[in-house]
């Protein structure tokens, strides 16, 4: 369970001792070395397949930079990532044990080069000692193939640093409270063509699940670069849970999301103090038919002066940790422009309609009657009406229902695992 902070508190990063910093650097240095070794083996296969029709496009920054399939990734796929190739047509790799690494492990399957479909003949908890970094493109992770109660990735982060990735019916429980390592349960530097479906992401130490940008290094082979910060493109997160982020660092946050041609629908954000979600990129942010429950000091916020928001038919349900009779307690969205480099204030545009704020009938009737709140900055009076759009911005295909129907659907179906006699574990319930 997350331990909630007072509504006035803001995110703070831990003050690390030199010993803790050295422990983190040692762990990541070793993992980078191992990942580089795996990538050196995978890259020739990736380049060979690129010549055969599966291009590797690490520099993609626009939706049309990445080719897309002619048919959806699976029946029911929607949004910007619906035409991801994933591992379609590639080899099938079976995970045969719950080991952190080695033959038959989930890590080995993820680090393998070439188009691949990862299936499981084991179920249980895969306890990681260091992050898994997926660098080779064209992969489908089919968690629904696991027997019993499915598979849970725990102990460390799962990072996607490539394109054309489909992940379904998986649990990511970062957990662990190593004071020297704070990160997401599920994140990374995703390039694009990303489809996340029916996953449960909890116990993050930064956010539970975040997809919005990738850091591109033209020299390749490196993990961090200040050269180019590019958007993730063609991304969908659907039917997924982001909940119960850990407050070890006063940072119990749900998600940072965004990118170009992105869509986030029929998901549940529950019992995270903030970032439910936060918008981490410009362009059009499509947030449709989601349920947000029990936030503390932040519901949905972010973006910049170039951002556009489609906030359509979502259900906001204040919980026991949500402050009553304060603006944040009935906030649908807080657009921001505080990081703008301009010498004058300009905010993005917002289309907000059909959202329910439980317990606030006036806001439910008119989302602009207190639900859309400008950031707290000097000289912002008068901007709210200028942000308002009376029509939705262009978005990828999303099957839209009413907020009431979305609430019922999400509570019954988000993170529902195929074949399991217990479709949700206690953390997802």
Residue spans of the language-model regions?
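Conserved small/polar residues in nucleotide/adenosyl-binding loops
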Residues: 418-423
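Acidic Gly/Asp/Thr-rich repetitive segments characteristic of extracellular carbohydrate-active
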Residues: 74-118
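Intrinsically disordered, low-structural-confidence terminal and linker regions
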Residues: 12-47
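Sec/Tat signal peptide C-region and signal peptidase I cleavage site
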Residues: 7-11
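Right-handed parallel beta-helix
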Residues: 138, 143, 147, 163-174, ...
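Active-site/pore-lining binding-face segments in mid-to-C-terminal subdomains
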Residues: 297-414
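Bacterial N-terminal signal peptides
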Residues: 1-4
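Extracellular beta-strand-rich solenoid/capping regions of secreted or surface-exposed proteins
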Residues: 107-114, 126-140, 151-168, 174-191
